[in-house]
A protein has these predicted regions:
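Bacterial N-terminal signal peptides
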Residues: 5-14
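Sec/Tat signal peptide C-region and signal peptidase I cleavage site
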Residues: 16-21
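Boundary regions of SH3-family modules and the immediately adjacent low-complexity/disordered segments
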Residues: 22-29, 55, 64, 78-102, ...
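A structural signal for short, hydrophobic beta-strand segments that form beta-sheets
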Residues: 26-37, 65-69, 101-106, 132-137
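Extracytoplasmic
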Residues: 28-29, 38, 72-74, 81, ...
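Fold-core signature of tandem repeat domains
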Residues: 35, 41-43, 57, 75-77, ...
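SH3/SH3-like (including bacterial SH3b) beta-barrel domains
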Residues: 45-68, 114-138
Length: 163
């Protein structure tokens, strides 16, 4: 019974993260997705692929706010410097900060790393029961990209719990 319940909770977490990856919500922060690493997402002056480019964003760039309703697949956005339009298929919403560090031994910490690898440089150490961790829409091989206390980095997902 416990295994069944744990499986359901795990699946809900996977589906919740997947749902956020496709969700675009006005007023919320989003990240750039579905762009090759050697390419850039164009922020355009108007909602058209033919409109002039006002800025370019890399895959994984976050801090992009959708400022209004999307129209015909195009969303008005701003990044703190410029305003423009992007196609919604290149945006994924950042999760609310609902996750906490768990399953870490008393007195131990969870390493926030630069890349999804246990060999990667440690950026910060997260204490047991530390909360307000937001999932960014990127995951790889059991690692989750997160934002916490002003840091962005990767943690092993098995040490996080939340909604």
């Amino acid at each position: 019974m416990i295994r069944l319940l744990a499986g359901v909770v795990l699946l809900l977490g996977v589906f919740t993260n997947a749902a956020l990856a496709g969700q675009v919500v006005p007023g919320e922060e989003h990240c750039v997705v579905n762009v090759r690493s050697d390419d850039r997402l164009n922020l355009r002056e108007k909602p058209s692929a033919e409109a002039p480019v006002v800025a370019r964003k890399r895959y994984g760039d976050c801090g992009i706010r959708v400022t209004g309703q999307c129209t015909r697949g195009w969303c008005p956005v701003e990044d703190g410097h410029v305003e423009g339009w992007v196609n919604r298929r290149f945006l994924a919403m950042v999760s609310p900060s609902l996750y906490c560090v768990s399953k870490v031994a008393a007195g131990d910490t969870l390493n926030l790393r630069a890349w999804p690898s246990s060999q990667s440089r440690v950026l910060a150490r997260l204490r047991r029961n530390q909360c307000d961790i937001a999932f960014l829409p990127f995951a790889k091989d059991g690692w989750q990209k997160v934002r916490v206390a002003g840091w962005e980095g990767w943690v092993s997902r098995r040490y996080l719990s939340g909604e």
